[in-house]
């Protein structure tokens, strides 16, 4: 039943349409033009972006995407479509659309599809468990911008984060236990979160606090020594200080400390993508083994796991139930 005419908008970061230099350039131009992502003065940043970053970075990033591209397309989009389909089946009668903050399918296209179905209450669910101004707030900005073109807008419920949701912690615990059962318990379990500039945290972003909260709850949930669970941050961009410790530096130092077997989980990524499949599963694995490590296993993202879809359903129904009461 959908008496309240609810509609769900799942949002993820985005992906290029193809693993080509031209497609990557278009995608990066949109992504890196967002002031939530790069907050430098446009007068300073645009010449850097178009004069240096896009000409030199696009071809290199295209080669990285080619390593992880599947017959169905970009893993992020493939899993996003599966999440959309499976969640719609669970919600039975409530339409679900997938939109990307950058690239396709666009937020505009997704919202338009929902409003054509007479949705009166829009539930926006960014697929970022931990809030950050550079990700979650960018979704809010994007949705608000799209709604400006409509005379009548729907009511909106924005799910800001779910870093401590019991179903989220339970789903992560399940994936960790499956990996331990398959590969044995490692010397260290490393939780790798996407990094952001330290300056963002210093000026009020709660992202680091939310990552630490998820880590603390996971430590309590799993049957594994808490002192053997580590945190680190990946994917830094540019020269300024980002959240530490950095994943790549951690990979190079652990073997010297006698740590020969590690497993890595990226709790902040709801779907596997370039940052998990290439950066962690391939590049950082190589760093660890080259530094003297012996065993490295990457624990997949929640993707289209049943426990992940159940989590998304609970997040949506939490709002629907409150509206119906």
Curated annotation (Swiss-Prot):
Domain of life from the UniProt record: Bacteria
InterPro entries xrefs: Ferrochelatase (IPR001015), Ferrochelatase_AS (IPR019772), Ferrochelatase_C (IPR033644), Ferrochelatase_N (IPR033659)
GO MF, one annotated term: metal ion binding
EC number in record: 4.98.1.1
UniProt main location, coarse: cytoplasm
Pathway, per record: Porphyrin-containing compound metabolism; protoheme biosynthesis; protoheme from protoporphyrin-IX: step 1/1
Coiled-coil stretches: none
Known role: Catalyzes the ferrous insertion into protoporphyrin IX.
Protein name, as recorded: Ferrochelatase
